[in-house]
C-alpha cells in the first residue's frame, strides 16, 4: 500500500520500502531480503534533519527488550553520506535500541536520496507516528514549508489537517526559548503555551511561565491570570480634546485684537471667555463712564 504522505510529497515508488511496517513478516522478507545490508553501527550517524530532539530513555529500553526477544523485524533505512558512513533516514529509535543492546551491526536498507528527500522523510515519518511534542511538530511543519516552498494552506491539504491546526502550531515558534524548552520537557502543555501568546511582552510571558510551573496552574487558571495582566497593561484612553476649527480661531483672535485696540484708546474694557461643549462665549463689559 502506498504511503499517502510520501506520494503527496513526490517520492512515489522511491520510498516504498519505508512503508513495510503494515505488512506481514513473510511479505517483508520477500520484499527486502536482497536489499538488506548488515552495516556496522560505528559507521552510522543520526539523521541531521531529525525533528525529534527528546528521546524517552524508558521507551528506548522497552524497544530494546522487544528487539532482544523478537529480533529487529523492520530494518532501519539509511543513505550513504560519505565513504563508509551512512545517515539514518528512518528508524533512529530502533538504531538507538540496537546500540543499547551492544550490537556491532544493524540490518539496514540503503536508499539513494538527496538532502531534501532525506529531511522530508524524517519529518513525515515522525509526524505519522504522532509522538512528537508540540514544538517538535511545529518545527517539522516549518521545515516542510521551507523544503517544498508551501503555504500553510497547501501543507494542511497535503497532510490532511486543518489550516488552523498548522497555524496554531507555528505560532508556538514565536515564543521565547524558555517557554519552548518547557514544552519540550513537558513542564507545560500546548494549551498553556498558546495562552501565553497574547502577552507580547517577553518578560511578562516568562513571569507567567514561572507561576504556571511553581503554582501548577491549570489552563483555566493560566488564562484568567493572563486576562488580568492584559487588562492591567491596556493603555488608558485619553480624553479627546475637541478640535477647534481654523475659522473659529480666526474669529476669536479678531475679537481679542479688537478689545486690545479699544483698551489702548483709554477705555477700561473687561472681557471674560468661557468654553462650552458646542460654543465659546465671550462677555464684554464697557463702562459708560471713564
Swiss-Prot record:
One of its GO terms (molecular function) is DNA binding. It comes from the Bacteria. It is found in: Cytoplasm, Nucleoid. PANTHER family: CHROMOSOME-PARTITIONING PROTEIN PARB-RELATED (PTHR33375), NUCLEOID OCCLUSION PROTEIN (PTHR33375:SF8). Pfam families: HTH_ParB, ParBc. One of its GO terms (biological process) is division septum assembly. Effects nucleoid occlusion by binding relatively nonspecifically to DNA and preventing the assembly of the division machinery in the vicinity of the nucleoid, especially under conditions that disturb the cell cycle. It helps to coordinate cell division and chromosome segregation by preventing the formation of the Z ring through the nucleoid, which would cause chromosome breakage. Residues 153-172 bind DNA. Its main location: cytoplasm. One of its GO terms (cellular component) is nucleoid. It comes from Bacillus cytotoxicus (strain DSM 22905 / CIP 110041 / 391-98 / NVH 391-98). This is Nucleoid occlusion protein. Belongs to the ParB family. NCBIfam families: nucleoid_noc (TIGR04285), parB_part (TIGR00180). Keywords: Cell cycle, Cell division, Cytoplasm, DNA-binding, Septation.
